[in-house]
Structures are given as C-alpha cells and as structure tokens.
Amino acid sequence: MRFVDEAVIKAISGNGGHGCVSFRREKFIPRGGPDGGDGGNGGNVVFKASTRLLSLYDFRLKRVYQAENGRPGQGSQMHGRGGKDLVVEMPVGTLVFERGENGAESLIADLSEPDVEVVIAHGGRGGKGNEHFKSSTMQAPRFSQPGEPGEEKSLRLELKILADAGLLGLPNAGKSTFISQVSAAKPKIAAYPFTTLVPNLGVMMDEFDPDRRMVIADIPGLIEGAHEGQGLGHRFLKHVERTRFLVHILSIEDVDMENPWAGFDLINDELQRFDETLGSREQIQVVNKIDLLPPEEVDGLRARAEADGRRIFFISALEGEGLDAVVSEMWRMLAELDRNVPLDSSRQIEPEPEEEFDVEVVWVRE
C-alpha cells in the first residue's frame, strides 16, 4: 500500500438555509399573517479516527471535503431540512492543524484514540423566517433572515504512527531482523545500510494470552544530524513520539572498545535535540549481532556495561539468542508505561513533502 504521512486539504461546512418570506393565504383569509419557516442549519464536517486506515494517501487524491447546505424555509411555517454532516474517517494518530492566512498553524484536533469524533468545521445557522419579525408595529414583515455561511478551513494533516514500542538505532543495526523475529512483520532485510526506507509495523502476540498484543514500529536508521532532517530524520523521528518506550538497538560492529556506547549516545543526543520529551523517554538498550564476536569478547562487553552502570541486553537477532529476555522486558514496560505522552506542538512544522513512499504493514492474523 502507499504510505503517506502528511497531506493538505480543505474542509467546508454547509451554509445555513435562508428564512422564508410567506403569508398565510386561505379561503376567506386573504390577508393572513406571516408564516415563513426557518432555514435549516448547514452540515458539519466531522473527522473520525478509524483503525481501517493506515495512511493519508486518500487525502492526496481528494483534497476538498464539503458538507451539505441547509435547505431554505417554506410557507406554512415549514422549516428547511438541515444539511447532512460529512463524516471523514482518518487514521488513528492523525493530528489536524489549521493553517492561517499568514501561514501560521495551530493544532485543532488530535485523533489519538479509535472512534474519536471531532467537529472540524461547524455548519452555518439557518436564517429565521418572517414570522419571527411580526410585531405590533409591523404585522406584515416582508423580509427574513438569510442563512449564515459555513466555515472554510485550510488544514494540514500529519500522521504519527501509534505504536507501543519504537525501534531505533543507526543504519544496519539489525532492527528489521529483530522485528521479524518477535512479530509477524516481514520487512526487507539485507546487509547494507538504509534497507528500511519507511516505517514498518509489527504486532507481537503474547503466547499465553492471545488478546494481549504489542504494536512495534521499526523506524528507518538514523544518522548524525537527524534532528535537522539529515537522512530524512525529521520525517522518521515523529513516528516514535507517541510510543510508550523505545528499544534502542546498536550493532556490535559499531562498538568501539575505547567508547563502546558512543552509538547509543549519538542517537540519544539526536532525540534530545529533536524533542526534549522524546530524549527522556524510557528505553531498552540492546547490542545486536553478538554472533560476530567470540564469546569471551562479548563477556568483556557485558562486564564493561555493568561497570559503566548501564543495563544492556546482548542478543543475536539472527540466531534468536537473548531475545526472550528483551521480549520479557518489553512486556514489563508495556504494562507500566502510558502512551499518552506530551505533544510538542511548538516545534516548527515542516512543509508538506511531495514524495510518497511504499510501505508494507503486516498484522498478525487471529
């Protein structure tokens, strides 16, 4: 499927129907009083979070969403029908920003939970018929109130994947191999950097409780300067902003005995520069590909980690060694941590990119 995480659209609510100018005309009542009905209210534009959608691709194809106008009032005090609301489904995790005339943006909706509905543009109010304007001094008003126009809003949509755990690290750290081992996701895997070019999602199931599951996001490899957009880092980092915790994977090939944990520190510095709240997110640190070193050298790294006061898991995702301990720790953190992390909406918003990406999202079948 086509994965798009940003789009610009317009939402236009319905206009209110005009009030009616009418007078009662019946047999033997040639000069009845005013009986013009009210116009109907315009329809609202409503955004609804849906688990059916995983991308904003549809909003690149259709960019204008308009609700129905209210119908005008009629004689005999008949009110016009209200316009139907337009309900637009959005992927769960979509942020809706309103764009002002000066280019400034403000967050108006956060569709972070399934089935949440938010009225984005309110329909115009219907006008009153001339029966409302009758008085002792004006018994035959020949005017009515026009309906109010609807709202028109220019919106930018931004999708942030809602995952429980986010995998991150330097390129070629083995994140895709890890997610393929612990979930049903089947990302592209090869022995060269930047194999993963778009986020992959996997779902890890509890073997003892089928209803217990964990959504994992495999984020493409990050490089130095990612917070400034190097290697499209700013496009990828936003997808881990809402995770409960991070699984930080470092390849043993990137471990230097003089400063073995420099790879962890580099990525953590990028997280801190991108968003301070993300930089302080709980994380599990993992050294992968221990099958490439003799066991005694791996034991030396374990001792070094303990001496440095770091809790680091040593694994071989390819051979499955050490995965059980990491998975157990992930389940523990899932139970203890909340996903509702603060949103830093003050960070400068990047302009909408023109490129699109392909991504395969695989879910476990029950």
Curated annotation (Swiss-Prot):
An essential GTPase which binds GTP, GDP and possibly (p)ppGpp with moderate affinity, with high nucleotide exchange rates and a fairly low GTP hydrolysis rate. Plays a role in control of the cell cycle, stress response, ribosome biogenesis and in those bacteria that undergo differentiation, in morphogenesis control. The keyword Cytoplasm applies. It comes from Oleidesulfovibrio alaskensis (strain ATCC BAA-1058 / DSM 17464 / G20) (Desulfovibrio alaskensis). The keyword Acyltransferase does not apply. Monomer. Residues 163-335 form the OBG-type G domain. This is GTPase Obg. Mg(2+) binds at S176, T196. GO terms for cellular component: cytoplasm. It is found in: Cytoplasm. GO terms for molecular function: GTP binding; GTPase activity; magnesium ion binding. Residues 1-162 form the Obg domain. Gene3D superfamilies: GTP1/OBG domain (2.70.210.12), P-loop containing nucleotide triphosphate hydrolases (3.40.50.300). It comes from the Bacteria. Belongs to the TRAFAC class OBG-HflX-like GTPase superfamily. OBG GTPase family. HAMAP family: GTPase_Obg. InterPro entries: G_OBG, GTP-bd, GTP-bd_Obg/CgtA, GTP1-OBG_CS, GTP1_OBG_dom, GTP1_OBG_dom_sf, OBG_GTPase, P-loop_NTPase. Keywords: Cytoplasm, GTP-binding, Hydrolase, Magnesium, Metal-binding, Nucleotide-binding. Its EC number is 3.6.5.-. PROSITE patterns: G_OBG, GTP1_OBG, OBG. One of its GO terms (biological process) is ribosome biogenesis. Its cofactor is Mg(2+).
